[in-house]
Amino acid sequence: MKFKKFSGVVGLMTVVSLALAGCGASSSEAVNTKDDGKLITVDVFDSRANYQGIQKGWAAKIFKDKFNVKLNIIAPNVAGGGDTLFDTRSAAGNLGDIVITTTGGGRMKKLVKAGLISDMTPYLKGMDNIKKFKKSSEALAKIAGKNGVWGLGMGVSTSSPTKPSEGVEQQDEPYIRWDYYREAGYPEIKDMDQFLDVLKQMQDIARKDQKDNKVYAISMFKDWDGSGMAFVQHMAAWFGYANQGSAFLKADGTDEQTVLTKDGIYQKILAWLHKAQTMGLVDPDSSSQNWDKLHDKVTNGKVLLSPFSFLGKPSFNSGERKAKGVGFALAPLQTMRPYSQGFINEGDLSYFIGIGSKAKNKQRLVKIINWLYSPEGVYASSNGTTACPKGMCWEMKDGQPVLSEFGEKVQFASEGVEVPAQWGGGIYADGICALNFPTIAPNDIDPETKQTYNSFLWPSELKKTNPLLSDWSKHMDGAKTEFEYLNKHKMVMVQAGVPYSAPEENSAQSARRTQINSAVVAASWKAALANSQSEFDKEIKEMTTKADGFGFKDIQKFDYAAINEHMAMSKKVAEAAK
């Protein structure tokens, strides 16, 4: 989930509200480890959540049974208004009982300085998982500029930083409705232009098959836009580019660009989307719909391209569909070079989880965080990247984890699947943990099963096949997984995993960045959905002119320094791992 940037006024307000929150804050706070165990509602301020309100369903039952708590999710992404909710709660001195938010832009340091989050050190007796991943808390303390256990990052790991962290598939790569690709005759896809021709063939076939002219090859959404169109930034990763602010850096460090680079990766993809628009391949709802609406369309078979692994396959590929040879699969795009980030032992420190300073029953809250970093907690907080809980979804057989029939259903297509009453009842998808905060990397090794948390990589799953996978494998050099195909063709570009958070910006630069981001996002959408080349060129020119006028050179200098610092750290880690 991309964090939504805030407006210039709100950005300045953030600094002010954090400063006000710190007025009168003491350097130490009373420590009380006593807890009467009564049912409590825990307010979770969560910058990554896509749901707001009381946690429902099977995940709610697990938290209630284990800790006697109800989680009340407070989600800026749902509330809207950029960072207004963060600013309002910060100014009041109480973000929430548990806090999940970004460290970027100096926020971590400001939160600690303002006394809005608590040092968990006094509550760590018996908290073995927090101690196990102390590299993460220590790295966060450096970002905070003050010693203490202020929280942990997401996706912590015990695996090598030079090893691709994604497993069977990269996060960002082109997935297509393989059944319609088959009906088109498995055409070659040499480059992105040819890809559009293939998508046009597929769209024509799909519309005829479904008797619906509202089936589109491409459908987008705006929820995650920040420094640019998030959809485009994800597509840039198809070709080995990682995004940091306005900048893009190739995984091997050989190229750096920005959103304004003429004929750079960002503008090339915008041009590709524009061409798709003129070919009638783009859903006209793209500029107004949200993630949920897009997800529904994909689930119902109305979209033919998924630019990332966590959309098409888990939403559409049910067992019943795969048995008919129907579903999403990796496209054989010959020019793709998917970006891969190596495992990060310290975790991704762009976001963290910690305890709010005004929280009561802090010992219980620390126990919850400690548990979230345990194997049991990883499965319980699954949102599709790992198996769901043992007993509910899988069991150990002959020393190996094996999915149950229910586990297979929800792992591959969870829409509409009912949960057994003993696990809380309701629809599985409605009960998924709303935190959207993966604590341990899904492809790290569970010390209890000796396999990954991700069931796609379990031996019991890898040996399974179905008509969809068999047909895909037959036309992809016999590969059994996406990663096997990409690795065989030396397509994956790995950047060694290191924890990195961009340096703090001053308020003036933050305000400039907000203006630039708004201009870039607005012009990008207009360019992508333009109906003529002249209109596209006009929007790109206007985007460049506006961004330059707002001081883009300063932003570029800052972002280039950040990506080069990040790359230097990656190279150092890679060298040490040899």
Go through each PLM region and give its residues.
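Helix-loop-helix "hinge/cap" segment bordering the ligand-binding cleft or interdomain interface
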Residues: 121, 153-227, 251-293, 297, ...
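Carboxylate/His-rich catalytic cores and anion/metal-binding grooves
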Residues: 116-145, 199-202, 213-250, 302-321
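Extracytoplasmic/periplasmic substrate-binding proteins
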Residues: 48-55, 67, 158-175, 182-186, ...
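Loop/turn elements at helix/coil->beta-strand transitions in domains of secreted/extracellular proteins
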Residues: 38-42, 67-71, 92-97, 116-118, ...
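Conserved N-terminal structural module of periplasmic/extracytoplasmic solute-binding proteins
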Residues: 3-4, 8-11, 20-194, 243-248, ...
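Conserved small-residue motifs centered on glycine
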Residues: 380-522
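Structured mid-domain segments that build the active-site/substrate or prosthetic-cofactor binding neighborhood
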Residues: 302-414
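Flexible loop/turn segments at secondary-structure boundaries
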Residues: 25-27, 49-53, 79-83, 105-109, ...
